[in-house]
């Protein structure tokens, strides 16, 4: 049963578009968001909010 939940909600990495290499790790629901995830989050290396894109 646990295998089914990991397929539906895989662990993904959100990589900074500022080019710093900083990443966030999160889960997403494939049924609700089948496209690649793009979130605006804080990058502590450049000390500002930048877009983080899903890297598989």
From Swiss-Prot:
Example of a GO biological process term: translation
Alphabetical list of InterPro entries matching this protein: Ribosomal_bL33 (IPR001705), Ribosomal_bL33_CS (IPR018264), Ribosomal_bL33_sf (IPR038584), Ribosomal_zn-bd (IPR011332)
Gene3D superfamilies: Ribosomal protein L33 (2.20.28.120)
Transmembrane regions listed in the UniProt entry: none
Keywords linked to the UniProt accession: Ribonucleoprotein, Ribosomal protein
UniProt entry tagged with the keyword Ribonucleoprotein: yes
GO MF term set: structural constituent of ribosome
HAMAP family: Ribosomal_bL33
This protein's name: Large ribosomal subunit protein bL33B
One GO term describing the cellular component: cytosolic large ribosomal subunit
Family listed: Belongs to the bacterial ribosomal protein bL33 family.
